[in-house]
């Protein structure tokens, strides 16, 4: 059992202690209506994931936001394991930044975990006025008690990779984390490692570039990101920018969970590879490609070659396995990273995607598969789209999956997702030998929501997880 502590703060003392935490019973995830044709606000869904419950794999609560077309996306906490030593802190508020409207919602999940309620709304004009930032993405809680949220743009939608700071108690906007004028040219995700005085951040593109869909000409014009920015954690400034060789659109970035670690991984979406970043003996940082998913030559698609499009990555809490999703090819992969320089493929499962048999795309040349995968049918439902956001249980034995990336790109690449809504699936993980297997008894079909098909995105457990919590 996990260590009992009567005077500790939120989360767990170490990542390995977290692995001993209780099994997840509910999951929170934002559901989006922007670009679906349904004039309804985005909402936070609560899903029952307890196999013993009569409501297993059902949405048990919906909290609608008060505005339309926010595009909720990712979420974070008011406090987490970085404040484990502070008994005055309680993980009871979920932070929901909007990637399009730039509005921030603070949701009370502490009073009634199965029926969250809105606690506070931070309007875009306050973010714009105090920070000159917009289009907000990743939210992390800090050991200082503050909440830090990455931005992708300025108020006009130009690229600007800065960070909004909120007071973790009042949720007042305090200003920017970075020094004035010290932002990165583009933003997206970030992760910090205080023992080494380092933060790393990634790049998608300017909101004006990505917001209405993907244009390959924008890649040729250099409008999509290809860098990792290395920041001095104490001085709040960029100390190194790593240009990644063959690393287009670096999205999710993760240090190893071990707070002493000096390395981690980033998923590069368009170039469909995983790159390892690491600290050199001299104190500088470098990056190297360690996994490559080959593109497939195809017919009947927007381009002659289809990348895997790695859109989410996760590390198990014991830093043993790396997981990632290929949203276009349709598979999730599991790699043993005991040797981080040479990840070893240990599991793979196809969950839909763009190359299934009987679809509009014909694969002409494939370096990996001998035939196109079968469409995925779960509980009689043919699953539209491909695997996208992933979340691992604390013990590493269950992987939850959703299928929506971002509404405008869903509409472009998987129009049937807009018509049918996304789904939530669950994969059983073999942590002894490696391996992934679909749980045929679990399906949340967001195509059957009361107001019409919705696009469900990132997943969070009430007690924290392997992409929300950072240990210091």
Curated annotation (Swiss-Prot):
GO cellular component terms, semicolon-separated: cytosol; fibrillar center; membrane
Location relative to the cell: Nucleus; Cytoplasm, Cytosol; Membrane
Catalytic EC class: oxidoreductase
Entry comment describing in which tissues the protein is expressed: Present in liver and colon (at protein level).
Keyword Cytoplasm: yes
Domain of life: Eukaryota
InterPro entries documented for this protein: Se-bd, WD40/YVTN_repeat-like_dom_sf
Protein name: Methanethiol oxidase
Organism, as annotated: Rattus norvegicus
Gene name of this polypeptide: Selenbp1
